[in-house]
Amino acid sequence: MKVLVVLLVTLVAVAYAAPGPRGLFINLEDGEICVNSMQCKSRCCQHDTILGIARCTHKAMENSECSPKTLYGIYYRCPCERGLTCEGDRSIIGAITNTNYGVCLDSTRSKQ
């Protein structure tokens, strides 16, 4: 138990000692390895396969494939950029398997 506490304290100290605005565990740039979308500046941690390495990447642009939400913090398809909505079918099974895909659409443009 002591070893775990010491390891945790050391990990936190290293994270806070990181120079500049970019940390070791947060504010990661596109292309850097991540384990959760909250670590990325873009707020999208994506992998291609279940065993693939997840990396930070930009959010989906208009007319690109997207995922509306994730239960796990890692996407197969990133959510849409600000101002766009991910339009597509949603199901409980798709939410669990992280396969609820849609297409990013500009909701203001589609109403006109």
UniProtKB/Swiss-Prot annotation:
According to its UniProt entry, one GO biological process term is:
post-embryonic development
The propeptide sits at 18-22
Q: Does the keyword Phosphoprotein apply?
A: no
Q: Which SUPFAM superfamilies match?
A: Colipase-like
What induces this one?
Expression levels increase upon lipid ingestion.
**GO MF entry, a single one:** lipase binding
Q: Which family does it belong to?
A: Belongs to the colipase family.
Q: What is this protein called?
A: Colipase
Question: What organism is recorded for this protein?
Answer: Rattus norvegicus (Rat)
Q: Which gene encodes it?
A: Clps
